[in-house]
Amino acid sequence: MRTAVLFACVTILPAGLAAQPASSLSADVREFVQVDAPVVALTHVQVVDGTGAPAASDQTIVLRAGRIAAVGPSDTVAVPGGAEVLDLTGHTVIPGFIGLHDHTFYMTRGRRVQLNFSAPRLYLASGVTTIRTTGAFSPYSELNLKSSIATGELVGPRMYITGPYITGAGASTQMKAVSSPEDARRVVAYWAEEGVDWFKAYTRIGHDELAAAIDEAHKLGLKVTGHLGVVTYSEAAEMGIDSLEHGLYA
């Protein structure tokens, strides 16, 4: 039997654009739109809902204005009149994945390349419909990419942007080194104003600087993660850090 996996709503419109009419999208984005209808029914599919429950067979999903309006056994879900009906017998539908540690750049020895064209498309092709970038070498590229996706100019997942790596002296020239708590607060306040959602502390950041960055971010309603080295996990936890990435090294 022919089988395939469909990621919920990706076959209809890219993530974040589902409520927009196709006519409002750029020509490049419209190429990814296979179905342009206000009401769509995906019938006779197998559904994996992401809760840990067993897969449910012969289900029907009704999408209205890009949102899931109903899910259930095909013999109980009423398909609205005028809906575009796709018989997807033999296919499986799962929720789009949320990536919590993602990048839009690629690193080789001595070289880092920003992938504003390919990265968002590859995330969607992998079923990832929302990403959190986790440290940026080009924060403005990512902020502009997020905006272009949200307005329908470019195709890609919904994005939550982490600002530049915040670290201490001796780090990569593409990271922001801070030398005092006041400096850390200033960096956080600046990038918060520019529109980032998270901050990432890196291995060389000191104790006082990390504590100040976390405090300032929390005052502004934002969060901090860290790939730490000088500061230990338990010390960062006591400071109130929101997340931790990778292993520990200096």
Provide a role label for each language-model segment.
Residues 28, 88-105, 115-228, 232-250:
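Divalent-metal coordination cores built from histidine and acidic residues
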Residues 20-26, 40:
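N-terminal amphipathic/hydrophobic interface segments
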Residues 41, 83-87, 161:
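Conserved beta-strand scaffold positions in the cores of enzyme catalytic domains, especially
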Residues 24-27, 32-34, 47, 52-94:
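Histidine-rich, glycine-flanked metal-binding segment
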Residues 4-18:
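Bacterial N-terminal signal peptides
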